[in-house]
Amino acid sequence: MKVTTIIAALLSVAVVDAQNNAQCRKLGLPCHATKTIPYVVKKGDTLTHIAHDIYKRKVGICDLAYTNHIGYNPDLIYEDQTLLIPTDCKTIDDGSCLKKHVS
């Protein structure tokens, strides 16, 4: 009986997790985020500063760039611009959006 209960609980968690992942993909949110919160850019802000210092590395630079459809210069943001910050990230992406320099 206990094994059946444990298996049922694990299956429920797996189904809910799959539904959440599908919903986030539908919303286009990176890092398996479940929602976003707004952030108004202040003078001198960069995505690096926002991700690392303000949000204490709970979101990645590239997660911010992808969520806000920022192109190949992830630090090209403007004062008073409202960014969406993905929350509850399961993975953090600090590199996939950055240009790779070949020597």
Curated annotation (Swiss-Prot):
Residues 37-85 form the LysM domain. The keyword Secreted applies. Keywords: Cell wall, Disulfide bond, Secreted, Signal. Gene3D superfamilies: LysM domain. Disulfide bonds join C31-C89, C62-C97. Residues 1-18 form the signal peptide. Induction: Expression is up-regulated during wheat colonization. Forms homodimers in a chitin-independent manner through interactions at the N-termini of Mgx1LysM monomers. Homodimers are further polymerized in a chitin-dependent manner. This is Secreted LysM effector Mgx1LysM. It comes from Zymoseptoria tritici (strain CBS 115943 / IPO323).
